[in-house]
Design a protein with these regions (language model features):
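Structured loops at beta-to-helix junctions and adjacent beta-edge loops in soluble globular domains
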Residues: 10, 105-107
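A glycine- and small-residue-enriched flexible loop/hinge segment at structural boundaries
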Residues: 39-90, 139-153
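Generic hydrophobic secondary-structure packing signal
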Residues: 22, 26, 73-80, 139, ...
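Acyl-thioester C-C bond-transforming condensing/cleaving domain
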Residues: 2, 18, 29-37, 86-98, ...
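ACP-dependent fatty acid/polyketide chain-elongation machinery
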Residues: 1-66
Length: 204
């Protein structure tokens, strides 16, 4: 008989609603999250709208500590993780931390951080890059920062399989629970809206 695996908490940040109640309400009412972009200049582009999360303030959810060097993608996923943990009433303890895992799906990772870091290295020279910002350029940085912030000491995996990354992460997590590799898993996906991702789709 297959093991019963359940979802106990949900954390969501989306352009049409942050928090599961707001997001579900928007879906039921058919409210779109597509708005004018404010994160970067679109004046020279034909398209000026996207699904942007407006007025995002990670500190209001997480407090100011440890946020200064994190990029937007990592902040988004840490807030979503906190919302999910709170919704599940799940507290990571010394007793369960090694049996708790993290699986995160992403298509492009922290593409803004990668681009900005490389731009500085190419234009100004490698010695002018800020080494403190380098961790943001690694694709598994957001997932790793979840484990660091919430002291999760079980396995930590980033799935990058294109547009199915988050679904693949969910399947990966389900398998690990089925195989008794973990008792609880924080699983999700993240993509940030930035100029680089916008241009990628704009050029299609």
């Amino acid at each position: 008989m297959a093991k019963r695996i359940v979802i106990t908490g949900i954390g969501v940040l989306a352009s049409n609603g942050s928090g599961k109640e707001a997001f579900w309400g928007a879906l039921k009412e058919g409210r779109s999250g597509i708005k004018d972009v404010s994160l970067f200049d679109t004046s020279n582009m034909r398209t000026k709208k996207a699904g942007e999360i407006k007025d995002f303030d990670a500190a209001s959810f997480l407090g100011p500590k440890g946020l200064r060097l994190l990029d937007r993608s990592t902040k988004l996923v840490n807030v979503a993780a906190k919302l999910a943990l709170d919704d599940a009433h799940f507290k990571v303890t010394e007793e369960n931390t090694h049996d708790t895992g993290v699986v995160l799906g992403t298509t492009l990772g922290s593409i803004w951080s990668i681009s900005e870091f490389d731009k500085t290295a190419l234009i100004e020279g490698p010695r002018y890059v800020n080494p403190a910002l380098f961790p943001n350029t690694v694709i598994n940085s957001p997932a790793s920062q979840i484990s660091i912030r919430f002291v999760i000491k079980g396995f930590n995996t980033t799935i990058a399989t294109g547009f199915t990354s988050s679904l693949d992460a969910l399947k990966y997590a389900r398998d690990f629970l089925e195989w008794d590799r973990a008792k609880a898993i924080l699983v999700g996906g993240v993509e940030e809206l930035c100029l680089q991702t916008y241009l990628g789709f704009y050029k299609l």
